[in-house]
Design a protein with these regions (language model features):
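A glycine-rich, basic-preceded beta-loop-alpha segment at the flavin cofactor/substrate interface
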Residues: 185-187, 191, 196, 206-220
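Core alpha/beta catalytic barrel or barrel-like domain that forms the active/cofactor pocket
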Residues: 49, 53-54, 76-91, 112-122, ...
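Internal maturation/activation junctions in enzymes
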Residues: 22, 85-86, 97-134
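Short beta-alpha junctions and helix-cap segments that line functional grooves
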Residues: 105, 131-132, 149-150, 191-195
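A short core secondary-structure module
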Residues: 143, 147-188
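Short Gly/Pro-enriched turn/cap motifs at secondary-structure boundaries
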Residues: 124-127, 152-155, 171, 196-204
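Amphipathic, small/basic residue-rich leader segments at the start of a protein or domain
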Residues: 1-84, 100, 104
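Flexible, glycine/threonine-enriched loop-and-boundary segments that flank and lead into catalytic domains
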Residues: 25-40, 44-52, 117-141, 145, ...
Length: 220
């Protein structure tokens, strides 16, 4: 079914998707029509969160099957693959998060209710990720607040993001970093979309976090 969707629905719309691109309107990203409709077709086919355990609504399929589906979508439209493929952040949540976080977020990925992003790169930290400076500050109630900028974030408009941030004061290397789950709210602003040479249907965002609430994934 993945091959049928990719070949009969996604691929014929790929050129129009690339011409239309993504737009930033009043602070919100608007996907090209073919992207939104393609994601809905994949959701209806139960291809979202396919590697997740059944207790969270997934299909409990091996990663190799997921990779094959992603390759099919990529061949049809790499822009849609970028967004669909970011369902993979649910695997990170499943591996490292506590049971409460898994129960709260994984069923939403499996149902195709949310899209994701992996917010790593910053203006001064690209391939050298140990230089990440976005700051995470722990609150008295055990939650965290994020402050700083992320750049070149694929699908940074996604509802759920995994954000790499500096959680330990006085550190300058990777040992001071932790991963956080952030659910989109008014404390994160999309400052702009990158003007790319291609794959225009996949939005690449610059993000400004201003005291954004987040949850620690795993341990510090």
């Amino acid at each position: 079914i993945a091959g049928e969707i990719a070949g009969e629905y996604i691929e014929p719309r790929a050129e129009d998707v690339d011409r239309a691109g993504s737009e930033l309107v009043a602070g919100e990203v608007c996907y090209a029509r073919g992207i939104a409709e393609g994601l809905e077709r994949l959701r209806q086919a139960d291809l979202m969160g396919m590697t997740l355990p059944r207790r969270y609504g997934g299909l409990n399929l091996p990663v190799s099957v997921s990779v094959m589906v992603i390759e099919m979508v990529s061949r049809a439209d790499p822009a849609l693959m970028n967004i669909f493929g970011l369902q993979d952040i649910s695997e990170t949540i499943n591996k490292f998060a506590d049971e409460e976080m898994k129960a709260a977020y994984l069923p939403r990925f499996a149902a195709g209710e949310v899209t994701g992003s992996m917010a790593l790169t910053e203006p001064e930290a690209g391939s050298d990720l140990q230089n990440v400076q976005l700051k995470a500050t722990e609150q008295p109630d055990g939650t965290w607040r994020l402050n700083g900028v992320k750049r070149f974030i694929t699908n940074g408009c996604g509802q759920i993001s995994l954000v790499l941030a500096r959680s330990e004061e006085g550190t300058t290397d990777a040992r001071g970093l932790s991963m956080f789950l952030y659910e989109r709210d008014e404390h994160m602003r999309i400052r702009r979309l990158e003007d790319k040479l291609g794959i225009h249907g996949s939005p690449t965002c610059e993000l400004q976090f201003d005291d954004a609430p987040a949850l620690l994934v795993g341990e510090r």
